[in-house]
Amino acid sequence: MPERTELSLKELYIGNAAVSRGLYEAGCSLISSYPGTPSTEITALETAFGASLAGVRSCCAMKHVGLNVAADPLFTLSYTGVNGGIVICVADDPGMHSSQNEQDSRHYAIAAKVPMLEPSDSAEAKAFAKAAFQLSEEYDTPVILRMCTRISHSQGIIELEDRV
């Protein structure tokens, strides 16, 4: 990696990339998602949970309808607790820009009794991804990071920091 200068400490990132940068800086060692059949979001969340039980910071990413599929392990995680922090990144789609419904994942956070963070721009997306691990480990619970279409695809300035 080239040496950073004062000018390169800030860069333009879309929201999704900012989350990725935040996960990296926070020391996330495993990211799982739903790559296609025959695996499912259930498998992805259970993989992240297994890593968490081993003390590894992990993340699972899915879109909002995938959270329906992963509801069983989500509710189990909420009462079994975690060892390494676990962040569940969920992409909601208000206005149905690229999905089949307008489901609101905030209802899952309430029902499962897990904290949810909802960034409003790229800088918050990065910061909240990092903060989610701290909350997860401090309170022994998974944390949902709710992204929506507009925040995921809009660009903003983020400050680059070193990995922990």
What is each residue range found by the language model?
Residues 1-2, 162:
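Iron-sulfur (Fe-S) cluster-binding modules
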Residues 3-13:
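Active-site mouth loops of central-metabolism enzymes
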Residues 11-42:
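N-terminal glycine-rich anion-binding loops that anchor highly charged ligand groups
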Residues 40-103, 107-137, 148:
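Thiamine diphosphate
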